[in-house]
């Protein structure tokens, strides 16, 4: 789960991470009022969307007067901002962050992530902070410095100092930098984050260290432990189908293809998408119905798949372990009848009560194509949608 920058900064502020003073605004009038409450000659008006690259796309403006704040707020609110992370459709700006400007001396990058290779938390830093960090990582990866944290002891002060010196943080500001990194790490662990990124982290001419931007991503599986984070969720920034899926306890991610997939188990779902691609098909979604699917849940899954107008066929791939194939078959039949399915439907069943499940599909009288294996099913659905 993602949150907006202004929400991320308030969360970090509560842990003692220094951030600029700022106020969220949902209207032009609120933006002007916010600017009046803030200090300093420069105000920064920042578009709030769940995507990076806002600066390059024109979503961050420096205002030197109240008139410019009003002008920029009017320009940004309601605008569709297209960045390298939004895709060509972009995202509509519905809120702004108005913030006090600061005299930047140097920009850095600081990020904390879970590393799949080491299975540990890794803290990354670079002296090349700012808008082009992705290009830096690709062109000169040696400029990204990493510190792996031992989970048994947590982040050690010497690791943060080592990072500071490698990044070229001024000696007089190293202690402040170490304090920020330590607090950010504590937040990361306490709140079950998967990403905590500050880009840029800046040193100022006044001798401060500030988180000028903040990106936080939280592990959705741990949200039940963090009601304060859940309260910050902005569903308007998410795919409506993914929001609907979460309400029905379905794991759904929309893709760009035309073959809808209904599978039980995340690993099998990924393998299903791979084998569809192998047979020159294009999956329209990742959809894991989990191990406890009911007829009602399968029906909701079908509705979800069919809400994508690009879908030209559906491949159901079930391996019944905890889940029983006859229950899934009943759900498929009920769902097909309820939604009036007219698209090609290929079903592959294996596992518990598989014979009973296949008989239910056969006796339904519906135009369901049976598959003997995952490869057979993928090949059949790829051919049917062409």
Swiss-Prot record:
GO terms for biological process: succinyl-CoA metabolic process; tricarboxylic acid cycle. Disulfide bonds: none annotated. Gene3D superfamilies: ATP-grasp fold, A domain (3.30.1490.20), ATP-grasp fold, B domain (3.30.470.20), Succinyl-CoA synthetase domains (3.40.50.261). SUPFAM superfamilies: Glutathione synthetase ATP-binding domain-like, Succinyl-CoA synthetase domains. Succinyl-CoA synthetase functions in the citric acid cycle (TCA), coupling the hydrolysis of succinyl-CoA to the synthesis of either ATP or GTP and thus represents the only step of substrate-level phosphorylation in the TCA. The beta subunit provides nucleotide specificity of the enzyme and binds the substrate succinate, while the binding sites for coenzyme A and phosphate are found in the alpha subunit. Heterotetramer of two alpha and two beta subunits. This is Succinate--CoA ligase [ADP-forming] subunit beta. It comes from Exiguobacterium sibiricum (strain DSM 17290 / CCUG 55495 / CIP 109462 / JCM 13490 / 255-15). The gene is sucC.
């Amino acid at each position: 789960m993602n949150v907006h920058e202004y929400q991320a900064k308030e969360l970090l502020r509560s842990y003692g991470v220094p951030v600029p003073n700022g106020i969220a605004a949902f209207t032009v009038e609120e933006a002007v009022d916010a600017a009046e409450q803030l200090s300093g000659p420069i105000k920064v008006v920042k578009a709030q969307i769940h995507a990076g690259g806002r600066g390059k796309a024109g979503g961050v403006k420096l205002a030197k007067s109240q008139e410019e704040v009003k002008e920029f707020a009017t320009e940004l609110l309601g605008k569709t901002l297209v960045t390298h992370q939004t895709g060509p459709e972009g995202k509509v700006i519905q809120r702004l962050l108005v913030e006090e400007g600061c005299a930047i001396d140097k920009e850095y990058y600081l990020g904390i992530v879970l590393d799949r290779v080491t299975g540990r938390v890794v803290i990354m830093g670079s002296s090349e902070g700012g808008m082009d960090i992705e290009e830096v990582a690709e062109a000169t990866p040696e400029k990204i410095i990493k510190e792996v944290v031992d989970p048994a002891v947590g982040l050690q002060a010497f690791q943060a100092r080592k990072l500071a010196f490698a990044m070229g943080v001024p000696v007089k500001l190293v202690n402040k930098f170490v304090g920020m990194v330590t607090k950010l790490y504590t937040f990361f662990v306490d709140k079950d984050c998967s990403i905590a990124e500050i880009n840029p982290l800046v040193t100022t001419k006044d001798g401060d260290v500030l988180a000028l931007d903040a990106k936080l991503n939280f592990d959705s599986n741990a949200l039940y432990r963090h009601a304060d984070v859940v309260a910050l969720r902005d569903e308007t920034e998410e795919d409506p189908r993914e929001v609907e899926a979460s309400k029905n306890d379905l794991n759904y991610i929309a893709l760009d293809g035309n073959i809808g997939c209904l599978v039980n188990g995340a690993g099998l779902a990924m393998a299903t998408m791979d084998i569809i691609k192998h047979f020159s098909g294009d999956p329209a979604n990742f959809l894991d119905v989990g191990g406890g699917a009911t007829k009602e849940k399968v029906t909701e899954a079908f509705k979800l798949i069919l809400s994508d107008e690009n879908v030209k066929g559906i491949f159901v791939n079930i391996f019944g372990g905890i889940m029983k194939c006859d229950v899934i078959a009943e759900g498929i039949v009920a769902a097909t009848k309820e939604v009036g399915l007219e698209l090609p439907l290929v079903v592959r069943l294996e596992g518990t009560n598989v014979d009973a499940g296949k008989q239910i599909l056969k006796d339904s009288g519906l135009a369901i194509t049976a598959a003997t294996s995952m490869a057979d099913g993928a090949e059949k659905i790829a051919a049917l949608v062409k």
